[in-house]
């Protein structure tokens, strides 16, 4: 079973495809959907086109996405909500449903500590998947952690 994990952002969107076969987990691909334009509507189009490519290039079975977190800047929250809405619609059109996990749930699932740092999550992601090289930026590690969180619940 291939699971797509998505860490939505307003500048980049981390993604990871993890394959679960019984108890075995394997990282198939991870990266960023990079947003190049500064115009919101065009950013949303770039994001959804990036998702389209992932859907077409991989036989994805399930999708998991990080739930919104609290931010101090209301403009950031509104912009992120617009991105999440577009991402959610694209996923629903393609798959009919998806799972959402809060940052606390992801940290708890991957590290055993809901207050873990991003660096601790990155360390455990590498360890759980037996990845030797550095995974950067942390948006990618977060997306992998989201996919792993979903895999644990299957």
Curated annotation (Swiss-Prot):
GO terms for biological process: DNA recombination; DNA repair. It comes from the Bacteria. Pfam families: RuvC. GO terms for molecular function: crossover junction DNA endonuclease activity; DNA binding; magnesium ion binding. Its cofactor is Mg(2+). Keywords: Cytoplasm, DNA damage, DNA recombination, DNA repair, DNA-binding, Endonuclease, Hydrolase, Magnesium, Metal-binding, Nuclease. InterPro entries: RNaseH-like_sf (IPR012337), RNaseH_sf (IPR036397), X-over_junc_endoDNase_Mg_BS (IPR020563), X-over_junc_endoDNase_RuvC (IPR002176). Mg(2+) 1 binds at residues 7, 139. Homodimer which binds Holliday junction (HJ) DNA. The HJ becomes 2-fold symmetrical on binding to RuvC with unstacked arms; it has a different conformation from HJ DNA in complex with RuvA. In the full resolvosome a probable DNA-RuvA(4)-RuvB(12)-RuvC(2) complex forms which resolves the HJ. Belongs to the RuvC family. This is Crossover junction endodeoxyribonuclease RuvC. It comes from Aliarcobacter butzleri (strain RM4018).
């Amino acid at each position: 079973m291939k699971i797509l994990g998505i860490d939505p952002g307003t500048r980049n969107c981390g993604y990871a495809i993890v394959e679960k076969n019984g108890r075995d987990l394997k990282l198939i691909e991870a990266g960023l959907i990079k947003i190049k334009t500064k115009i919101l509507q065009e950013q949303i189009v770039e994001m959804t086109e990036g998702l389209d490519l992932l859907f077409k290039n991989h036989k994805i079975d399930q999708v998991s996405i990080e739930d919104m977190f609290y931010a101090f800047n209301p403009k950031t929250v509104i912009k992120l909500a617009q991105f999440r809405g577009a991402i959610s619609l694209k996923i629903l059109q393609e798959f009919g449903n998806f799972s959402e996990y809060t940052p606390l749930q992801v940290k708890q699932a991957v590290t055993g500590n809901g207050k873990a740092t991003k660096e601790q999550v990155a360390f455990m992601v590498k360890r759980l998947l037996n990845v030797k090289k550095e995974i950067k930026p942390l948006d990618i590690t977060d997306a992998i952690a989201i996919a792993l969180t979903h895999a644990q619940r299957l």
